[in-house]
Design a protein with these regions (language model features):
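A conserved acidic beta->alpha catalytic loop
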Residues: 113-128, 144-149
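Short, acidic, metal-binding catalytic loop of nucleotide-sugar glycosyltransferases
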Residues: 93-106, 116, 131, 205-206
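Short aromatic/hydrophobic "clamp" motif used to bind/position activated sugar donors
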Residues: 182
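Hydrophobic targeting segments
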Residues: 73-82, 94-97, 106-113
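N-terminal membrane-anchoring/stem segments of glycan-assembly enzymes
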Residues: 1-67
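Long helical/loop segments within the catalytic core of UDP-sugar-dependent glycosyltransferases
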Residues: 132-136, 140, 145, 151-171, ...
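A short, charged/proline- and glycine-enriched loop
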Residues: 69-76, 178
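The conserved acidic donor/metal-binding loop of glycosyltransferases
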Residues: 186-190
């Protein structure tokens, strides 16, 4: 339906220009006014989210979370589903994890690969494990089997398999499930240095924390200056759109890299 409405609008404007030129002028003026009002409306939400974001990133959230009793009991299970990702992409991701302002001995990192990409994945994991495996509390490698009956191959299936394998590790370590936060990241997600401290702070103060989902701000600027001009425009436009949605409670949803209680 949205596609039909878009093309109908274009076709109607062109047809009216020949059949009823005056109507076409009125139609275009109304259409332009509609989008002017809508852009101003969205700009308010965009600026609201942007100023909140800028204030949040300037705060040392680790200092604040340390004032909450029991913060050190919280562990973060980070699942990174991959499929044919080159080692330099994963190296950037793990480099950002290693640089966060949060105790790394509270992080359980799962690098989840696909059996369809087994050779490339195992070669990549050897490099990543050698460089970063020792800096986290636990570093787990999983391989999602192919052709599981009734399963649709994709990130969700890979992450689900990885979570099931991580559950065995958490049970062995006897960590209470309510003390574990699961972050389902994309393979190229680079968290802000304060992200996990802020996440822990929010989690501990939430009145119903084990029944909530936590959606971070997604800013698509990892390799923006290495991307083609058109892709940069698309990425920036997506970032702006997501910022406007963050300020609208009725538009909140989880996507891409998000977190919830185990």
């Amino acid at each position: 339906i949205p596609g039909v409405m878009v093309w109908s609008t274009f076709v109607l404007a062109i047809v009216l220009a020949f059949v009823k030129p005056l109507w076409a002028i009125y139609f275009i003026i109304v259409f332009d006014c509609y989008w002017l009002v809508r852009i101003c409306y969205l700009l308010i939400y965009l600026l609201n989210s942007w100023f909140k974001y800028r204030r949040a990133v300037k705060i040392n959230w680790l200092e604040k979370v340390k004032k909450i009793m029991g913060w050190e009991k919280v562990y973060h299970l980070i699942i990174l589903p991959t499929y044919k990702e080159p080692v330099n992409v994963l190296r950037t991701t793990f480099g950002s994890l290693a640089a966060i302002n949060y105790p790394l001995d509270k992080l359980i990192v799962v690098l989840a690969g696909e059996e369809r990409d087994q050779v490339n994945f195992l070669n990549t994991t050897q490099i990543i494990e050698k460089e970063f495996g020792h800096i986290f509390f636990k570093f787990l490698i999983t391989l999602h089997p192919k052709d599981i009956e009734g399963e649709l191959a994709g990130k969700g299936a890979n992450a689900t398999w990885a979570a099931k394998q991580a559950t065995k590790l958490i049970d062995e370590l006897q960590i209470p499930y309510e003390d574990v936060l699961v972050s389902n990241f994309d393979a190229d997600t680079c968290p802000h240095p304060e992200y996990f401290s802020y996440l822990t702070y929010t989690f501990l103060l939430h009145p119903n924390r084990t029944r909530a989902s936590y959606q971070p701000v997604a800013v698509y600027n990892n390799n923006i200056w290495d991307s083609p001009a058109m892709l940069r425009i698309i990425n920036n436009s997506t970032t702006f759109w997501l910022f406007t949605d963050l300020a609208r409670p009725e538009r909140l949803f989880t996507f891409s890299s998000h977190c919830m209680s185990f």
